[in-house]
């Protein structure tokens, strides 16, 4: 069974991408694991700014699988097992391990229940503030009871998108990067930057803003003529600049090296040299403008970090 569902998402640009199915028989699993390893701390770091789209998390994912009986089990059948555990979040701290089989959740037996249903059960208990989450798991031929305490995180689904393009997406509910981007980045810090930028778009409600602006521009275009459309590229560049600013803070709060932002954009500029990218050129800030803005943002972050101040962006000036 797949770990992540197959569907289609609209990207920040006009492109659409197919989301990669991750099951243990495909070569995409290492990419998916790396993607979630990098993304989870960013979602936690941004939690203060997505109060509407916030939910507690433990840092693990589940899957369905056919299993042999564990000690005290009933025989061969279907069980829910742990498909992923983030090394820095509560599930790992409690001792949950990849491949552990779930027996019960807060003393409710989950044998024979699908992973999707178990995940919903965990979410309901967490939203109801039933803490800690108590998991009974089959582990190495025996049983073990683990207590997990949740941490707050943004409720954005993280997706890996099939495309050779170097791109990311944010639609208000999801964030994702392409397989081309995964191959392009040279470090987890560079990948963190791509994800932090997309998370910032969601935190700042840019997809909703873009929809409202599109409706307004369509109305103005119908009543005043096509000249109203000339403001669209400027508006989109402004959204990108704001996402750069807040994204740098998200990245810093998650503990990633924000100097990687400059390295990323310099390599992107080198890659784009000589290429015809009219949509990107019109709707995104130039690399020179981005690097100049980053220098100001990085200085601002460091001035707060040195005396131990909280890394809070000036949201009023970025919305």
Give the role of each language-model region.
Residues 1-2, 319:
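Short, low-complexity, intrinsically disordered N-terminal peptides in bacterial proteins
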């Amino acid at each position: 069974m797949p770990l992540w569902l197959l569907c289609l998402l609209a990207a920040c640009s006009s492109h659409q991408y197919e989301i990669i199915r991750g099951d243990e028989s495909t070569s995409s699993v290492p990419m998916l694991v790396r993607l979630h390893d990098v993304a989870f701390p960013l979602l936690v770091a941004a939690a203060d700014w997505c109060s509407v789209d916030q939910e507690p998390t433990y840092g693990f994912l589940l899957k369905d699988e056919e299993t042999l009986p564990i000690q005290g089990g009933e025989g061969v059948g279907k069980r829910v097992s742990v498909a992923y555990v983030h090394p820095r979040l509560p599930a790992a701290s409690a001792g949950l391990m990849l491949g552990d089989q779930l027996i019960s959740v807060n003393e409710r037996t989950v044998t024979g229940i699908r992973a999707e249903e178990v995940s919903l059960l965990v979410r309901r208990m967490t939203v109801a503030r039933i803490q800690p989450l108590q998991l009974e798991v089959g582990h190495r031929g025996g049983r073990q009871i683990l207590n997990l305490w949740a941490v707050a995180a943004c409720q954005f689904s993280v997706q890996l998108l099939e495309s050779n393009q170097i791109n990311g997406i944010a639609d208000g509910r999801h964030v994702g990067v392409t397989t081309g981007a995964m191959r392009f980045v040279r470090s987890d810090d560079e990948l963190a930057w791509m994800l932090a930028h997309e998370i910032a778009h969601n935190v700042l409600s840019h997809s909703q803003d873009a929809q409202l602006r599109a409706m307004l521009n369509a109305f103005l275009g119908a009543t005043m003529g096509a000249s109203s459309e000339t403001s669209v590229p400027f508006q989109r560049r402004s959204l990108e600049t704001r996402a750069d600013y807040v994204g740098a803070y998200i990245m810093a709060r998650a503990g990633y090296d924000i100097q990687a932002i400059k390295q990323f954009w310099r390599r992107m500029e080198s890659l784009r040299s000589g290429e015809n990218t009219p949509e990107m050129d019109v709707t995104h800030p130039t690399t020179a403008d981005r690097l100049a803005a980053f220098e100001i943002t990085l200085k601002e972050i460091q001035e707060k970090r040195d005396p131990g101040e909280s890394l809070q962006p000036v949201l009023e000036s970025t919305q």
